[in-house]
Amino acid sequence: MIPRVIRLWLPSALFLSQVPGCVPLHGPSTITGAVGESLSVSCQYEEKFKTKDKFWCRGSLKVLCKDIVKTSSSEEVRNGRVTIRDHPDNLTFTVTYESLTLEDADTYMCAVDISLFDGSLGFDKYFKIELSVVPSEDPVTGSSLESGRDILESPTSSVGHTHPSVTTDDTIPAPCPQPRSLRSSLYFWVLVSLKLFLFLSMLGAVLWVNRPQRCSGGSSSRPCYENQ
Protein backbone atom coordinates (compact mmCIF):
# COMPACT_ATOMS: atom_id res chain seq x y z
CA MET A 1 0.00 0.00 0.00
CA ILE A 2 1.37 3.42 -0.95
CA PRO A 3 1.93 5.73 2.06
CA ARG A 4 -0.41 8.71 2.30
CA VAL A 5 2.42 11.23 1.90
CA ILE A 6 3.57 9.62 -1.34
CA ARG A 7 -0.02 9.39 -2.61
CA LEU A 8 -0.43 13.12 -2.06
CA TRP A 9 2.96 14.07 -3.50
CA LEU A 10 2.87 11.90 -6.62
CA PRO A 11 0.00 13.75 -8.40
CA SER A 12 1.67 17.06 -7.60
CA ALA A 13 4.91 15.85 -9.15
CA LEU A 14 3.06 14.68 -12.21
CA PHE A 15 1.32 18.05 -12.51
CA LEU A 16 4.52 20.05 -12.11
CA SER A 17 6.23 17.94 -14.75
CA GLN A 18 3.60 19.15 -17.24
CA VAL A 19 3.87 22.86 -16.42
CA PRO A 20 6.02 24.64 -19.06
CA GLY A 21 7.86 26.72 -16.52
CA CYS A 22 8.90 23.61 -14.62
CA VAL A 23 10.33 21.71 -17.58
CA PRO A 24 14.15 21.77 -17.27
CA LEU A 25 14.60 21.73 -21.04
CA HIS A 26 14.48 24.67 -23.40
CA GLY A 27 14.60 25.11 -27.16
CA PRO A 28 12.69 26.48 -30.13
CA SER A 29 9.06 25.47 -30.25
CA THR A 30 9.03 25.46 -34.07
CA ILE A 31 11.73 24.95 -36.69
CA THR A 32 11.53 25.04 -40.49
CA GLY A 33 13.79 23.52 -43.13
CA ALA A 34 13.79 23.04 -46.89
CA VAL A 35 13.74 19.75 -48.78
CA GLY A 36 17.24 18.45 -49.45
CA GLU A 37 18.92 20.73 -46.93
CA SER A 38 20.27 20.12 -43.43
CA LEU A 39 18.72 21.48 -40.26
CA SER A 40 20.08 21.65 -36.72
CA VAL A 41 18.28 22.33 -33.47
CA SER A 42 19.81 22.85 -30.03
CA CYS A 43 18.16 22.00 -26.73
CA GLN A 44 19.42 23.41 -23.44
CA TYR A 45 19.27 21.53 -20.16
CA GLU A 46 20.02 22.21 -16.51
CA GLU A 47 23.35 21.63 -14.82
CA LYS A 48 22.06 18.63 -12.86
CA PHE A 49 21.42 16.77 -16.13
CA LYS A 50 24.93 17.30 -17.46
CA THR A 51 25.89 13.63 -17.21
CA LYS A 52 22.53 12.19 -18.24
CA ASP A 53 21.74 10.58 -21.55
CA LYS A 54 20.05 12.78 -24.13
CA PHE A 55 17.83 11.57 -26.93
CA TRP A 56 15.60 12.74 -29.78
CA CYS A 57 12.22 11.13 -30.38
CA ARG A 58 9.32 11.52 -32.78
CA GLY A 59 5.75 11.93 -31.55
CA SER A 60 3.45 14.36 -29.79
CA LEU A 61 2.85 12.17 -26.72
CA LYS A 62 5.61 11.35 -24.27
CA VAL A 63 4.57 7.74 -23.74
CA LEU A 64 4.36 7.14 -27.50
CA CYS A 65 7.37 9.18 -28.57
CA LYS A 66 9.55 6.93 -30.74
CA ASP A 67 13.31 7.19 -30.07
CA ILE A 68 15.35 8.12 -33.14
CA VAL A 69 18.84 8.79 -31.81
CA LYS A 70 20.43 8.83 -28.34
CA THR A 71 23.78 9.84 -26.88
CA SER A 72 25.46 9.11 -23.57
CA SER A 73 28.60 11.20 -24.12
CA SER A 74 29.92 14.18 -26.04
CA GLU A 75 30.66 11.97 -29.05
CA GLU A 76 28.41 12.35 -32.06
CA VAL A 77 25.94 9.53 -32.58
CA ARG A 78 24.31 8.90 -35.95
CA ASN A 79 21.18 7.04 -36.96
CA GLY A 80 20.63 7.31 -40.69
CA ARG A 81 20.23 10.97 -41.61
CA VAL A 82 19.96 12.10 -37.97
CA THR A 83 22.87 12.88 -35.65
CA ILE A 84 23.01 13.99 -32.02
CA ARG A 85 25.91 15.51 -30.09
CA ASP A 86 26.03 16.58 -26.45
CA HIS A 87 27.89 19.75 -25.44
CA PRO A 88 28.31 19.55 -21.65
CA ASP A 89 30.39 22.74 -21.56
CA ASN A 90 27.43 24.92 -22.52
CA LEU A 91 24.73 22.51 -21.31
CA THR A 92 23.19 21.92 -24.73
CA PHE A 93 22.84 19.05 -27.15
CA THR A 94 22.35 19.42 -30.88
CA VAL A 95 20.28 17.31 -33.25
CA THR A 96 20.96 17.57 -36.98
CA TYR A 97 18.78 16.37 -39.83
CA GLU A 98 20.45 15.80 -43.19
CA SER A 99 18.72 15.77 -46.60
CA LEU A 100 15.32 16.76 -45.29
CA THR A 101 12.22 15.33 -46.94
CA LEU A 102 8.59 16.36 -46.72
CA GLU A 103 7.92 13.19 -44.71
CA ASP A 104 10.21 14.48 -41.94
CA ALA A 105 7.68 17.15 -41.00
CA ASP A 106 6.19 16.15 -37.64
CA THR A 107 6.23 16.74 -33.90
CA TYR A 108 9.49 15.83 -32.14
CA MET A 109 10.86 16.01 -28.61
CA CYS A 110 14.31 16.59 -27.24
CA ALA A 111 14.60 14.69 -23.98
CA VAL A 112 16.83 13.77 -21.05
CA ASP A 113 16.82 10.20 -19.78
CA ILE A 114 16.23 10.11 -16.02
CA SER A 115 16.76 6.88 -14.11
CA LEU A 116 14.27 5.62 -11.53
CA PHE A 117 16.62 6.19 -8.60
CA ASP A 118 17.79 9.63 -9.61
CA GLY A 119 15.49 11.62 -7.34
CA SER A 120 12.89 12.34 -10.03
CA LEU A 121 10.99 9.05 -9.89
CA GLY A 122 12.39 8.15 -13.29
CA PHE A 123 10.34 10.74 -15.20
CA ASP A 124 12.22 11.69 -18.36
CA LYS A 125 12.33 15.38 -19.25
CA TYR A 126 10.88 16.40 -22.61
CA PHE A 127 10.56 19.51 -24.73
CA LYS A 128 8.22 19.49 -27.72
CA ILE A 129 9.35 20.90 -31.10
CA GLU A 130 7.34 21.21 -34.31
CA LEU A 131 9.37 20.57 -37.48
CA SER A 132 8.06 21.99 -40.76
CA VAL A 133 9.56 21.15 -44.15
CA VAL A 134 8.97 23.30 -47.23
CA PRO A 135 9.83 22.54 -50.87
CA SER A 136 13.14 23.93 -52.08
CA GLU A 137 13.84 25.75 -55.33
CA ASP A 138 15.69 23.65 -57.89
CA PRO A 139 18.82 25.57 -59.00
CA VAL A 140 18.50 24.08 -62.49
CA THR A 141 14.91 25.17 -62.69
CA GLY A 142 15.89 28.59 -61.43
CA SER A 143 18.56 28.97 -64.12
CA SER A 144 16.14 27.72 -66.71
CA LEU A 145 13.64 30.30 -65.58
CA GLU A 146 16.31 32.99 -65.80
CA SER A 147 17.19 31.88 -69.33
CA GLY A 148 13.55 31.85 -70.27
CA ARG A 149 13.16 35.30 -68.77
CA ASP A 150 16.13 36.56 -70.81
CA ILE A 151 14.64 35.06 -73.96
CA LEU A 152 11.33 36.72 -73.26
CA GLU A 153 13.00 40.04 -72.56
CA SER A 154 14.96 40.04 -75.84
CA PRO A 155 11.94 40.21 -78.18
CA THR A 156 10.45 42.82 -75.90
CA SER A 157 13.51 45.03 -76.31
CA SER A 158 13.52 44.50 -80.09
CA VAL A 159 9.87 45.40 -80.25
CA GLY A 160 10.72 48.54 -78.34
CA HIS A 161 13.35 49.45 -80.97
CA THR A 162 10.93 48.85 -83.81
CA HIS A 163 8.13 50.71 -82.09
CA PRO A 164 7.69 53.25 -84.96
CA SER A 165 7.12 50.44 -87.44
CA VAL A 166 4.70 48.79 -85.03
CA THR A 167 2.90 52.11 -84.79
CA THR A 168 2.55 52.29 -88.57
CA ASP A 169 1.30 48.71 -88.53
CA ASP A 170 -1.23 49.68 -85.95
CA THR A 171 -2.50 52.43 -88.25
CA ILE A 172 -3.03 49.96 -91.11
CA PRO A 173 -6.35 48.70 -89.75
CA ALA A 174 -7.64 52.31 -89.68
CA PRO A 175 -8.94 52.23 -93.30
CA CYS A 176 -11.02 49.17 -92.43
CA PRO A 177 -14.08 51.27 -91.56
CA GLN A 178 -13.94 52.95 -95.00
CA PRO A 179 -15.64 50.10 -96.92
CA ARG A 180 -18.31 50.08 -94.28
CA SER A 181 -18.86 53.83 -94.61
CA LEU A 182 -18.74 53.46 -98.39
CA ARG A 183 -21.40 50.77 -98.26
CA SER A 184 -23.46 52.90 -95.92
CA SER A 185 -23.17 55.84 -98.29
CA LEU A 186 -24.05 53.60 -101.23
CA TYR A 187 -27.09 52.28 -99.43
CA PHE A 188 -28.09 55.82 -98.57
CA TRP A 189 -27.88 57.06 -102.14
CA VAL A 190 -29.65 53.98 -103.47
CA LEU A 191 -32.44 54.57 -100.99
CA VAL A 192 -32.61 58.25 -101.90
CA SER A 193 -32.64 57.37 -105.58
CA LEU A 194 -35.44 54.85 -105.07
CA LYS A 195 -37.46 57.35 -103.11
CA LEU A 196 -36.83 60.01 -105.75
CA PHE A 197 -37.78 57.58 -108.51
CA LEU A 198 -40.94 56.62 -106.64
CA PHE A 199 -41.79 60.27 -106.08
CA LEU A 200 -41.27 61.14 -109.74
CA SER A 201 -43.30 58.11 -110.81
CA MET A 202 -46.19 59.14 -108.58
CA LEU A 203 -45.92 62.72 -109.79
CA GLY A 204 -45.92 61.56 -113.40
CA ALA A 205 -48.96 59.38 -112.78
CA VAL A 206 -50.83 62.28 -111.20
CA LEU A 207 -49.95 64.59 -114.08
CA TRP A 208 -50.95 61.91 -116.57
CA VAL A 209 -54.34 61.43 -114.97
CA ASN A 210 -54.99 65.17 -114.73
CA ARG A 211 -53.78 66.04 -118.22
CA PRO A 212 -56.28 68.08 -120.35
CA GLN A 213 -58.23 65.93 -122.84
CA ARG A 214 -58.58 67.01 -126.49
CA CYS A 215 -61.63 66.57 -128.65
CA SER A 216 -61.29 64.12 -131.42
CA GLY A 217 -63.58 65.97 -133.83
CA GLY A 218 -62.31 69.49 -133.50
CA SER A 219 -59.05 71.25 -133.86
CA SER A 220 -56.16 69.30 -132.52
CA SER A 221 -54.91 72.31 -130.60
CA ARG A 222 -58.18 73.02 -128.78
CA PRO A 223 -58.76 71.05 -125.59
CA CYS A 224 -62.10 69.36 -125.08
CA TYR A 225 -63.68 69.99 -121.68
CA GLU A 226 -66.55 68.02 -120.30
CA ASN A 227 -69.75 69.65 -119.04
CA GLN A 228 -69.38 72.87 -121.13
Swiss-Prot record:
One Gene Ontology cellular component: plasma membrane
Xref: SMART domains: IG
Domain Ig-like V-type: 25-126
Membrane spanning residue stretches: 188-208
Main localization category: membrane
Sites annotated Interaction with TYROBP or FcR gamma: K195
Keyword Cell membrane part of the UniProt annotation: yes
Subcellular location(s) per record: Cell membrane
Keywords of the record: Cell membrane, Disulfide bond, Glycoprotein, Immunity, Immunoglobulin domain, Membrane, Receptor, Signal, Transmembrane, Transmembrane helix
Topological relation to the membrane, as annotated: Single-pass type I membrane protein
Glycosylation sites: N90
Cytoplasmic side: 209-228
Span of the signal peptide: 1-24
Polar residues bias: start-end ranges: 154-170
Start and end residues of each stretch annotated as Disordered: 139-174
One annotated GO biological process: positive regulation of cytokine production
Disulfide bonds: C43-C110
Family: Belongs to the CD300 family.
Protein name: CMRF-35-like molecule 4
UniProt source species: Mus musculus
